[in-house]
Amino acid sequence: MAHETMSFQAEVKQLLHLMIHSLYSNKEIFLRELVSNASDAADKLRFEGLADNALYENDPNLRIRIGFDKAARTITIDDNGIGMSRDEAIANLGTIARSGTKEFFTKLSGDQQKDAALIGQFGVGFYSGFIVADKITVETRRAGLPANEAVRWESAGEGDFTIDAIERAQRGTTITLHLREGEDELLSSHRLKSIIQKYSDHIALPILMQKEEWDQEKGEMVLKDEDETVNQASALWTRSKSDITDEQYTQFYQHVAHDHQDPLTWTHNRVEGRSEYTQLLFVPAHAPFDLWNRDYRGGLKLYVKRVFIMDDAEQLLPQYLRFVKGVVDSADLPLNVSREILQESRDVKAIREGVTKRALSMLEELANAEEEAGKEKYKTFWSAFGQVLKEGLGEDHANRERIAKLLRFASTHGDTDAQDVSLADYVSRMKPEQSKIYYVTADTWQAAKNSPHLEVFRKKGVEVLLLTDRVDEWMLSFLHEFDGKPLASVARGDLDLGELNDEEKKAQEQAGEAIKPVVEKMKEALGDKVKEVRVTFRLTDSPSCLVADDNDMSGYLQRMLKAAGQNAPAMQPILEINPEHALVKQLNADSASFGDWCHLLFDQALLAEGGMLDDPASFVKRTNALLLSRAA
């Protein structure tokens, strides 16, 4: 096919500009990204070669070769992986196919190190070559295609690229970087080796370079006619833990997770028995930008007998652990395993159970750490992934107790919104006469902390958990008790503090009798707005509050469902009034303004719990009328 010039997709032009002008101080990443792509090409060949061994073309020894030419001022990255066809070269090098392109650009922070990590995460690492090169030439032939169907792709990174048909005997891809002025320091074996060993030492393929030796006569380093392997070239997880440094684990994590930060913790072990596999699992220090997207692909890299199978084997982890990164290498699964087989395999079920237990053990070690550094790591983990972990209470019945021990909440025990109180902490501080774990749900920490429902608890010195995450109401439908102590909402049902409130109960009953006519008239005045009006002892400073009946949905959950566009069943709350409050004491059931006072007490209670008024204008009008009547 003839020489053809094509234009880059608009997003690629934007990306090229970013690469060239914004990431220069982090230019070493170009080699990391191109080596990573070459490694992926080898993985793809291994995978496709399982079904068609002829793709190896009698050249089964996969490798990456890196070279440089001082005279031509070029660096080459050559692999004998899967290669590309003409259409694949156009698609992979001329467009960004990923749906998250816009998100990529919105996530750029200006922090060069962070932005450099995003490049790999979005699969656009090839373009990082333009940081150091003003022209890139790619020659490639897909395994299985004839030599005359190879292609040359070339671009100066300025908006278009050319495609030519060429002859190429070797399958795979050769990338030639024509260096920009001022980049000659890269034309050195020592410099390139140091970059490879810094970023790509963990790559399982051998990375070859021409040997370089000192020539006494010439007084300089000269290239020899033989290659040497410049990386470890063995799968990290297959090596003994004692032979792997923390730095090597960290580099490997950054490779598999496309993350610039260090992991919080990791675990590495071999499992033998009914299922044989090796697992290397990491907990990241921060959540990926798309963790809550519907199409987020969690899961681990799956290998079978060291042969790469797939990138995101979701079946190996429950959804609530989707943030865990790493590798599972199975000795038992068939090499032709598919996603469908993964869903039905007994071996996979055993691996999933084992991986889940190991991941939870990893979190337990952090959560129970005695030293300050470990505690800080768990706080970091919780702020990033706490809401995701809460999903496990509904998803994983077998491990529900273990997950419950890992939960952290804000509470009235502290003065900040920090979620650092475990259920075990709460139980250890319970009053001797206290039989329940109390909580309140609200939209914000401020709203929860100032909820009128907490007044009697403050008076009695009883701790209350402050739950403000959107997942909390759902979580509570699965978390009914902890350590034999039932969880109870302070805003639901008829409050019973057991022996803690015997005196108040007697006083409440007496006060209730005294204002019984007023309570009955209030119910008439409010009509269908409320299920019931009753006297309460849960208030000490506020005149009124709303509570849900024992089996009804809370107001907070109703608001959440409405915000999510779902139909929330209409619920009638219970209005509780404080007989000791001056506003309640002055209520006169026979006055003309009695109905307005009743509605005001209801509306105030609704606002105090974070609710929305159905008719704000009437509320303002009613309040103004009552204020004027008082002033008069």
UniProtKB/Swiss-Prot annotation:
Residues of the region (A) are 1-339
Q: Where is this region: C?
A: 560-632
**Any Pfam family the entry gives:** HATPase_c_3
- Which keywords, in A-to-Z order, does the entry hold? ATP-binding, Chaperone, Cytoplasm, Nucleotide-binding, Stress response
A GO cellular component annotation here is: cytoplasm
Reading the lineage from the top rank, the first entry is Bacteria
In which compartments does the protein localize?
A: Cytoplasm
UniProt keyword Chaperone present:
yes
GO MF annotation terms: ATP binding; ATP hydrolysis activity; ATP-dependent protein folding chaperone; unfolded protein binding
- Region described as B: 340-559
The record's function comment reads: Molecular chaperone. Has ATPase activity.
Q: Which HAMAP family match?
A: HSP90
* Self-association state and partner proteins as the record states: Homodimer.
UniProt family annotation: Belongs to the heat shock protein 90 family.
Q: This protein is called what? A: Chaperone protein HtpG
